[in-house]
Amino acid sequence: MRKLVNLSSNFTKKTRLKGNIKFVIIHYTGMQSEIESINRLKNPRSKVSCHYLINRKGKIIQMVKDNKVAWHAGRSKWKKYTNLNDRSIGIELVNKGHKFGYQKFSIKQINSLIILCKSLKKKYSIKQENFLGHSDIAPLRKIDPGEKFPWKKLSSYKFGHWFKSNFEVDRKRLQNTRRVFFKNLYKLGYRYFNVYKKNSNDKKVIKSFQRRYSPYNVTGKIDKKTLKISHFLAIN
């Protein structure tokens, strides 16, 4: 795997053990250019960084060594874990994001991401379900990598799970829609909601799930399709 090196000083100085790396978190840069993104990831005042950046041409740039904690996840939760920075590798894909003109990720970019993920998965024994998006672990704050990110394609390489297009679910299991849906999400690893009581976080969490698994249907509402997908993923 070919990669360039352009190191940032934005990382926690203490070296972490290889066994502590359990997740890969995928982001988009959300800035107007590659140069602007790199400058921000290297600026000490920004207090943000990533381990790898992949540009539109598919070049992989290492910005923080794997054994250091980069500052990419921020306030985050997934299953029993909080502050996913400590346990993850952060990958930024150059993309203008929703603020500046959200783009389809380039073929070269995704091909390089797959190569990088294969290497990381093998090196750190990362489980298939532990390839996540920033919005999965921080749904109240973040929406990246967004609905144009090809999670279905990545799942075919065993990076993240997907659902079968023709699956059936027992109707009885779909009664009490909201509670069933959030129980399913809790089992998957999502947090920031109350299974038994509606709150103001619900819509953002639903949208986060839809951006990943139902990208043409990001409504923030629990419709039949969204509910069925959540159930399939929770039981498989």
Question: What label would you give each PLM region?
Answer:
Residues M1-E129:
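Active-site-adjacent loop/helix surface patches within enzyme catalytic domains
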